[in-house]
Regions:
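Amphipathic/hydrophobic helical signal segments and adjacent flexible N-terminal regions
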Residues: 2-11, 17-78, 202-212
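Conserved Ser/Thr-centered positions that define the repeating blades of beta-propeller domains
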Residues: 180-182
């Protein structure tokens, strides 16, 4: 998910966003702390029925994942960091938001945190994804969807080079996220990030049609 000086990726909208109830129609949910009212109103328990089968593309990831993040540095070495990713439906189930967190390491005192917002564009017939990493002044747009047995998203990185993000080896309790960049207009691709995810025990969510 973009290489923030190769140190880490990630987001923040509070972990409570994943468990709140949807509020389609009527007043927004009331919370004891007004500072959390927006978070409560944002979350949805399920995808919106209008998405149909497209909901399955990212619904399979809803929940919390423990991550082994690996960053491929320019000198050929690979740096590993631990972290987590959280997926959940938002905006009346019309979009998915995910939080990417890498834990402090390599002398850093703060975690790295960023967010992706994913929604299905009914005109383009593709998923559009916006990723933001405020700590690194980073933002990027991609779009794509299912391609065979994986999810592929394409866009342009902040340095103007083509990038390709993909979800691979997708299983009920694991998947591999890969970030690649091309320096020859898409003829060849170099892996910059490869992150191995395992679902946290007890954090499995049934998919829209009951299939993991």
């Amino acid at each position: 998910m973009a290489t923030f000086d190769k140190a880490g990726i990630c987001f923040a909208l509070a972990l409570g966003v994943l468990g709140a109830r949807p509020t389609q129609g009527g007043p927004s949910s009331q919370t004891a702390d007004p500072r959390k009212a927006m978070i409560a109103a944002l979350a949805s328990a399920n995808p919106n029925p209008s998405l149909g089968d497209e909901a399955r593309t990212f619904d399979r990831f809803v929940g919390t994942w423990d991550c082994d993040f690996s960053f491929h540095l320019d000198d050929g070495t690979v740096r590993h960091q631990r972290g987590e990713v959280l997926f959940g439906w938002i905006l009346d189930g019309r979009a998915v938001q995910d939080i990417w967190i890498t834990y402090p390491a390599y002398g850093r005192k703060d975690r790295a945190i960023g967010t992706s917002l994913r929604f299905f564009d009914t005109k383009l017939k593709q998923w559009r994804v916006i990723f933001v990493g405020p700590q690194f002044n980073y933002a990027v747009n991609t779009q794509g969807g299912l391609e065979g047995e994986r999810i592929v998203l394409r866009g342009t990185d902040s340095d103007g080079l083509p990038l390709r993000w993909s979800f691979n080896e997708m299983k009920a309790d694991s998947f591999v996220w890969r970030g690649e960049k091309s320096r020859d207009g898409g003829k060849t691709w170099k892996v910059e990030e490869e992150h191995h995810m395992k679902r946290r025990p007890g954090h499995r969510a049934a998919s829209a049609d009951g299939v993991p």
